[in-house]
Amino acid sequence: MPVVQNACSFVRLLASGRDRAKFLHNFCTNNIKALETGSACEAFFTDVKARILAHGYVLAFEDAHEIWISPGDPAALLKHLNRYIITEDVAIVADNPSSATLCFHADENVLTALRAEQVAIGGDELSDGAIAAAVDQTLSIRFGIGEAEQNTAVTGLLVTWAKQPVLFLTGPAGPLAALGSRLDAAGVSALSNDEIESLRIDERYPLMGRDMASENMAPEAERNVQAISYTKGCYLGQEPIARLDAMGHVNRALRVVEISGPCEVASASGCPLKTTDGTTAGTLTSVILRPDGISHGLAMVKVNSIHQPLHVTDDSGNERMVHVRSA
């Protein structure tokens, strides 16, 4: 059972110290101080101008917080956060670079199989109600696999993507791959890279360096409900985000697009979206071919062009009509 090795993998930063929640709260867009042990939330880390430095999830545990971000430049975020630590009791370090990720459609079959594997680390995190709870909230779990005296710690993130509960597991690559093989033998198969990518696109979950970059402001991802708290108080980047909220819209936004027919996946990402008069209306950032032969993807689109007829021409010369899905 292969572990996930594409851009849907997460890299982790680990935060410890009694001031960690308050510190992270002050440097990301969501309400970290409100997180209870065993919960998690999506968040952006931004600079003072609300430009995105990183995006992902913050997971709360009794003794630490974990920051899960898409592969990109975790060292830059680590350097950014550490430069603001002065007298606070907080330490932030990078996780082991050999860590890897498994991803599953989260259902009770998965939890049953994992309970058979686990050596519990504090509490019964893999409870029968965990899947039902994930429909309304994002959860974090931590457990061990292997023999009790030398178990390997695994961290899990339970989220809802495109209205489907999804479980990500991360840990050392070797033991995690072995766990995946045992689960597969038990009839529980991890999602393939293409399945994860299709879910990610339908969820409109951006990858830094592909769908979003450091010149983008956090609200342009249009994940305000999931990742931005407008009531948490001050944090780095809060003022520009509040101004955009007061304006009522951004000038460009990340949207799901459906493409009328197969599109050369390898060459389509980065292609411009054009209006009927040839004006550039946006850029295709991610694309995947569905089993039904229709391509869908993500695109950064000018808001005033979202309802216009658009088309894209890939590097092979294929011109396809593009429909921008409502947010």
Predicted stretch roles:
Residues 27-33, 81-86, 183-188, 245, ...:
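Short, solvent-exposed amphipathic alpha-helical segments in soluble enzyme
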Residues 17, 67, 104-106, 169, ...:
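Residue-level signal for inorganic ion chemistry
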Residues 1-55, 59-62:
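Acidic, proline/glycine-enriched N-terminal capping motif
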